């Protein structure tokens, strides 16, 4: 029986971004594979974070940004003429940022914020279960179950990042975007987040920007290499790191530039 290729959860076609007339992304085509960790690598300023922000329209918040081309979620154009409500889109495509950014609220209220905003469950027992389940999925429940009323900002850096992941998954997104989620963390906290990412891909499609070649090789199944606003090469992570087809990719992963 022939194995069917993995279907894309999201796609980009001729996706371009200009900031005040300056090109940051130049007509990118890319499929985001469902049920995988899709890593985006490349030197600083190559467009990978700009691309990531296109996937849930975070670039809409930047006045000078102009986006053209197409990006789809399950075949629906998120920039189409009818438009997709950015708030609803961001519930389906969550985001975890480079530095942990818990709200100045309790641990409980950080996780409950999204479900309350979208009216997903009732307060009380239903919300309690959702908060607990989200914290368990983020590998944080046992560490905070007795201090849920404490401020999220009172946690360690690694715990704060896991709290932000719990907050993202509390609204049951289909895709989680991660913009260098470990860059501000120590090696122990980084290892825990990487383990968590591997667990989460059983439920969510993940797109992750990382500057760490080792991290991309460890946690992703598909890797796209960006350079100067374009995609140079995309493929299975093992192939990208062991037998890249493009000499520019080879130069980057071996440290000759970047």
Curated annotation (Swiss-Prot):
Highest taxon in the source lineage: Bacteria
Binding-site list for ATP: 42-49
Pfam families named among the record's database cross-references: ABC_tran (PF00005)
EC numbers: 7.3.2.1
GO BP: any one term: phosphate ion transmembrane transport
Gene Ontology MF terms: ATP binding; ATP hydrolysis activity; ATPase-coupled phosphate ion transmembrane transporter activity
Coiled coil: none
GO cellular component: plasma membrane
Statement: the UniProt record of this protein carries the keyword Transferase: no
Ribosomal protein as UniProt keyword: no
Cell compartments where the protein resides: Cell inner membrane
InterPro entries in the record: AAA+_ATPase, ABC_transporter-like_ATP-bd, ABC_transporter-like_CS, P-loop_NTPase, PstB-like
ABC transporter domain boundaries: 10-253
Keywords noted in UniProt: ATP-binding, Cell inner membrane, Cell membrane, Membrane, Nucleotide-binding, Phosphate transport, Translocase, Transport
Catalysed transformations (reactions): phosphate(out) + ATP + H2O = ADP + 2 phosphate(in) + H(+)
Gene3D superfamilies xrefs: P-loop containing nucleotide triphosphate hydrolases
Membrane topology: Peripheral membrane protein
SUPFAM superfamilies hit by this protein: P-loop containing nucleoside triphosphate hydrolases
NCBIfam families found in the cross-reference section: 3a0107s01c2
Function summary: Part of the ABC transporter complex PstSACB involved in phosphate import. Responsible for energy coupling to the transport system.
Subunit structure: The complex is composed of two ATP-binding proteins (PstB), two transmembrane proteins (PstC and PstA) and a solute-binding protein (PstS).
Family according to the record: Belongs to the ABC transporter superfamily. Phosphate importer (TC 3.A.1.7) family.
Protein name: Phosphate import ATP-binding protein PstB 3
Species this chain originates from: Paramagnetospirillum magneticum (strain ATCC 700264 / AMB-1) (Magnetospirillum magneticum)
